[in-house]
């Protein structure tokens, strides 16, 4: 019986979606613009990386050709040097969003059909009733922020006041999120999580996709820094995801990274949540090596997005892509005959773009495994085609959305 590994390179988009203009993202292209910046010398950082973007293993799987399908051009340095060794294509999202839950749920076969609730870019950003309910139920002296903000910028601006007053920092973005930042020691990590659980309930009537705990440490004198103890409190997806199908069939499932949070811990099997892309990939490979027949490992690599995309850090993003590329041989080595690996993304986050938000982009679809004949998949009209294809590969009943490419 076959096994499958699905890897989401968080935010690694490959060109603006057909409707990107509706989001202010027409012309965005995460991978393409990083490659162009590196080719022009704008991706260099002493001690980190230099020169053109070097992704020989991803190029051999068809990444450059997937980019060409999405934008009409192969990014600098991403043309394959020999025959492509995977099925390759690009996918567009049917859900009206460019957020993590929408992307992942659609990949898993359940596109979001109703619009998420969003908070206006005003100050205050949150309805007074929401804030009052959170303050009362969580026993808070008040909140700070109450605005759209970059997470790293707002803790630098308000971290000292937060420590002094005990008021958590609450902020949002263009995504459907309510984020709460608090000092792990001064406020307490478990107290932050409990505050977020309350906020999750308070935000439900507003159809907010995620409440996110953003713990940090440090001081005004030495600077504040986020820790690895982020936790997402998501709305549960509609029934019928690939994960639900696997659970019903009694299959082994391992969720690595923030997959458990994204799917509200429903049908996510054994959850492993290390810190950082490298540790997450280590955990996924270890889990896959011992995975029984018919099993599934679902991996999210979030550092592309959080550490580099939102921070508009081209050299850092390029280095992260190159680090993943170097480890592709390890991924290929754990695949046995009959196994399938799919590499994709959930949205874009072009580090050359304006602002600090996600970008509405198409995503790569790279599928490979021993014995799989390489071919072009073309444009997939929904991210759900990936979930449908994995389900078919694993011998599960068809999902409610998506067309398998088999």
From Swiss-Prot:
Mn(2+) 1 binds at residues 10, 346-347. It is found in: Cytoplasm. It comes from the Bacteria. Keywords: Cytoplasm, Isomerase, Manganese, Metal-binding. GO terms for cellular component: cytosol. The keyword Cytoplasm applies. Mn(2+) 2 binds at residues 305, 310, 358. Pathway: Carbohydrate degradation; 2-deoxy-D-ribose 1-phosphate degradation; D-glyceraldehyde 3-phosphate and acetaldehyde from 2-deoxy-alpha-D-ribose 1-phosphate: step 1/2. It is an enzyme of class 5 (isomerase). Its main location: cytoplasm. GO terms for biological process: 2-deoxyribose 1-phosphate catabolic process; 5-phosphoribose 1-diphosphate biosynthetic process; metabolic compound salvage; nucleotide metabolic process. Binds 2 manganese ions. GO terms for molecular function: magnesium ion binding; manganese ion binding; phosphopentomutase activity. Its EC number is 5.4.2.7. InterPro entries: Alkaline_phosphatase_core_sf (IPR017850), DeoB (IPR010045), Metalloenzyme (IPR006124), Phosphopentomutase_DeoB_cap_sf (IPR024052). Its cofactor is Mn(2+). It catalyses: 2-deoxy-alpha-D-ribose 1-phosphate = 2-deoxy-D-ribose 5-phosphate; alpha-D-ribose 1-phosphate = D-ribose 5-phosphate. Gene3D superfamilies: Alkaline Phosphatase, subunit A, Phosphopentomutase. Belongs to the phosphopentomutase family. PANTHER family: PHOSPHOPENTOMUTASE (PTHR21110:SF0). NCBIfam families: deoB, PRK05362.1. Isomerase that catalyzes the conversion of deoxy-ribose 1-phosphate (dRib-1-P) and ribose 1-phosphate (Rib-1-P) to deoxy-ribose 5-phosphate (dRib-5-P) and ribose 5-phosphate (Rib-5-P), respectively. This is Phosphopentomutase.
